[in-house]
UniProtKB/Swiss-Prot annotation:
Gene that produces this protein: MX2
Biased composition (Polar residues): 39-50
Descriptive protein name: Interferon-induced GTP-binding protein Mx2
CDD domains tied to this protein: DLP_1 (cd08771)
GO cellular component terms, A-Z: cytoplasm; microtubule; nucleus; plasma membrane; presynapse; synapse
Region: G5 motif, residue numbers: 322-325
Swiss-Prot/TrEMBL keywords: Antiviral defense, Cytoplasm, GTP-binding, Immunity, Innate immunity, Nucleotide-binding, Nucleus
Pfam families for this protein: Dynamin_M (PF01031), Dynamin_N (PF00350), GED (PF02212)
Region (G2 motif): 147-149
Region (G4 motif): 290-293
């Protein structure tokens, strides 16, 4: 019988040391003195630092693989009851952890986020396949060149039943009746996925093995690292493999199992170098040394230094195993016999037997160690995993809302579908008009954006008044000479006043039209963005709506521009109500004469224009009227021009867009054409629905997990 997973007493070997070790029966990887209850009983160099999770039995690490299946004797009969109880606790507490992650992986959740896993990497001919064979109890593809051409998820489940296997990839599921079928089915799967050549693929192959002779463990086997392309391989095959490996080992959720032969310089191995690149402190990397029987004499101490973490430090340390070699396979050495030979090798080796005593050697202890590490890793990852699933689910739901519902096939249903789409769009346009749309914290509403342009219009009007004041003397003198008639010196010439007013009001037309243009662009872009938000996935409908928005904008722009120009033509009438003008005139006159009274106190040499008192009187009087009139006109224009813009470019523009959208419903023959989706929209919607479904299932699985403390 081959390997079996159960507690076993093992006689500890006498270590090569001057210190005396009494001979006693203990579990074969327990270290004296034992840790207190609640801590993992782990060998030196790879003691797990955290306390035991609540769902792990305190003596969890006393479970191991029994390579020899000895006859039950008196002492062992006495411990059978406690052993069975311990194993039952294991079945109840530990297996669900691995099953949970395997179920999430089976749902396809790994497409959306990284799951806790153990990834196995190694250079070509490192002995990686032999290690996996020893753990799984089945023969895997072997040979020269690239053998593993797709990531292989190896799910091992210990159960008291007949051996069963199942291989799954793409939409294919193949039940396996006995272990001998595994190698051929894996090769077949790789050829289907990656082709019959020597290329690789990122697509997963899932291999499930259920047997009483395997540990509870899930591993991901990755292609061996190669440096040089051979035969029909792509020239960049080495880069392709590294990219595939890095995709897995760079995830913080992955424990990296790096397989390295004992008979090579560990510093030159590509696998360990890649692991160090993504995990520089070795927090989640375990080194596995293979082929200890091929170590040259005199170099054994170098291997021991590696195992003692003195050569290439890894926080989780190293394990060492001796698996079947090519000669063993040729001689058809069974895995069970290979396990017994491995134990004998370490028991009798003058240098390496201490590693067996320390619990760092043999495949059974490696299996136990990996199971322990995986359980710890899963427990630590569960709270983060729950948050990630929740966030991904929310994002996918929000994204799906943007794509809307599936388009109905029935013509009557299409009408209601289109009505609903237009209704929601029109509601958003209405909110834009009323200044009630929902915006992000860093954004502002449409009405506020337009109001900012109106604020700049106030500045333009104020600047224009100041400009008139600054050149009043020069302008009035010029126009007095041109338009003065028979009136006596000092009288105000109305023609001069009127001409100055018309001239400076005329300079406001272009700024007003530019403000109209800016406001139009703001509204137009906002309406376009709203249309894109609602109709982007319906290319014909979206284009139709964009055209209508463009046509309406052009007409509204022309009407608003005409009305603004009409307003300025009316301003040439130079009119203001007597009651209003009289009040403003008196206030301005009072302000000006008060300022002139102060100015008269200054030396006359600084006011050359005061030499002609009659001219002063005329200029001051016209200045009073110009200031009064421009103040009142500016008030009128400050409101009137924004009124025109807001009415034509926002209010009426929005109303006409809404009516134009409703008119689309009258053309019943074009419903199918209008609702024609972009080629990838249906695919995206389907993808998001599937993603939401599997994330919902994942949330449910976590919720139902009895030991989850999230």
């Amino acid at each position: 019988m081959s390997m079996s997973f159960r507690p076993l007493k093992y006689k500890r070997h006498t270590q090569t040391s001057t210190q005396h070790h009494p001979k006693q029966d203990i579990y074969f990887h327990q270290q004296p003195p034992g840790p207190p209850l609640g801590q993992t009983m782990s060998p030196p160099q790879w003691q797990v630092e955290e306390s035991n999770p609540d769902f792990l039995p305190n003596n969890f690490n006393q479970l191991n693989l029994d390579p020899q299946q000895p006859e039950a004797k008196g002492g062992q009969q006495m411990s059978k009851g406690p052993e069975n109880n311990l194993y039952r606790k294991y079945e109840e507490k530990v297996r669900p952890c691995i099953d949970l992650i395997d179920s999430l992986r089976a749902l396809g959740v790994e497409q959306d986020l990284a799951l806790p896993a153990i990834a196995v990497i190694g250079d070509q001919s490192s002995g990686k396949s032999s290690v996996l064979e020893a753990l799984s109890g089945v023969a895997l593809p072997r040979g020269s060149g690239i053998i593993t051409r797709c990531p292989l998820v190896l799910k091992l489940t210990k159960r008291e039943c007949e051996w069963t296997g199942k291989i799954t990839y793409r939409n294919i599921t193949q039940q396996l009746q006995n272990p001998s079928e595994v190698e051929w089915e894996i090769r077949r799967a790789q050829n289907i996925i990656a082709g019959n050549g020597l290329g690789i693929s990122h697509e997963l192959i899932n291999l499930e093995i259920t047997s009483p002779e395997v540990p509870d463990l899930t591993l991901i086997d990755l292609p061996g690292i190669t440096r040089v392309a051979v035969e029909n391989q792509p020239q960049d095959i080495g880069l392709q493999i590294k990219a595939l490996i890095k995709k897995y080992i760079q995830r913080q959720e992955t424990i990296n199992l790096v397989v390295v032969p004992c008979n090579v310089d560990i510093a030159t191995t590509e696998a360990l170098s890649m692991a160090q690149e993504v995990d520089p402190d070795g927090d989640r990397t375990i080194g596995i040394l293979t082929k200890p029987d091929l170590v040259d004499k005199g170099t054994e101490k170098g291997v021991l230094k590696v195992m003692q973490n003195l050569t290439y430090h890894l926080k989780k340390g190293y394990m060492i195993v001796k698996c079947r070699g090519q000669q063993d396979i040729t001689n058809k050495l069974s895995l069970a016999e290979a396990t017994r030979k491995e134990t004998m090798f370490f028991e009798t080796h003058p240098y390496f037997r201490i590693l067996l005593d320390e619990g760092k050697a043999t495949v059974p202890l490696l299996a136990e160690r990996l199971t322990t590490e995986l359980i710890w890793h899963i427990n630590k990852s569960l709270p983060l995993l729950e948050n990630q699933i929740k966030e991904k689910h929310q994002r996918a739901t929000e994204e799906l809302q943007q794509y809307g519902d599936d388009i109905p096939s029935d013509e009557g249903d299409k009408m209601f579908f289109l009505i609903e789409k237009i209704k929601v769009f029109n509601e958003d346009i209405g909110k834009l008009i009323e200044g009630e749309e929902i915006v992000m914290e860093t954004e502002s509403r449409l009405c506020n954006k337009i109001r900012e342009e109106f604020t700049s219009w106030i500045l333009i009007l104020t600047t224009n008044i100041e400009k008139v004041k600054s050149i009043l003397n020069e302008e009035v003198s010029k126009y007095e000479k041109k338009y003065r008639g028979k009136e006596l010196l000092g009288f105000v010439n109305y023609k001069t006043f009127e001409t100055v007013v018309k001239h400076y009001l005329g300079q406001l037309i272009d700024p007003a039209l530019k403000m109209l243009q800016k406001a139009m662009e703001i509204v137009w872009q906002t309406f376009k963005d709203t249309a894109k938000k609602h109709f982007a996935e319906f290319c014909n409908l979206h284009q139709t709506v964009q055209n209508k928005i463009e046509d309406i904008k052009t007409k509204q722009m022309a009407e608003a521009a005409n009305l603004i120009q009409l307003q300025f033509r009316m301003e040439k009438l130079v009119f203001c109500q007597d009651q209003i003008y009289g009040v403003v005139l008196n206030k301005v006159r009072e302000d000006i004469f008060n300022s002139m009274g102060k100015a008269s106190e200054t030396p006359q040499s600084k006011q050359p224009f005061l030499n002609d008192q009659s001219s002063i009187s005329s200029i001051v009087e016209i200045g009073v009227h110009l200031n009064a009139y421009f103040m009142e006109t500016s008030k009128r224009l400050a409101n009137q021009i924004p009124f025109i813009i807001q009415y034509f470019m926002l209010q009426e523009n929005g109303d006409k867009v809404q009516k134009a959208m409703m008119q689309l419903l009258q053309d019943t023959q074009h419903y199918s054409w209008l609702l024609q989706e972009q080629s990838d929209t249906a695919t995206k919607r389907k993808f998001l629905k599937e993603k939401i479904f599997r994330l919902t299932q994942a949330q449910q699985a976590l919720y139902e997990f009895p030991h989850f403390k999230g």
